[in-house]
Amino acid sequence: MKRDLSLAGTAEEILRRSSDIIFSMIKDIAMKEPSPVEQTGEVTVFKRRRPEDGNLAPLKTTAEAYDYIRMLQAEGYPRAFVETDELRFEFEDAEVADDGVIAKVKIRNKFTKL
């Protein structure tokens, strides 16, 4: 049983859409009791993300930065960031613009409070 899922928007938006699909599938499974079908194809294994995986510094394109920012915007996920020696810049609400990406940024001092 497969359903299409749009990957547009933030991680939070994608998770909401996927939950709607999952609940619909649960209802179908309970009512129709389909026969299991063995999966085919190559197995893909993903490593668990760590907070430091959200660092934008190694990225090369604005498209990569946009995807990082939007995919790390969900409850429980640390935001995409860039750091200097003293400051941490955390990004959210990314939008593609004509000449790059526009996003909200929260700037934190890494070692002291305001």
Predicted regions mapped to residue ranges:
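Active-site-proximal loop/hinge segments within enzyme catalytic domains
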Residues: 1-112
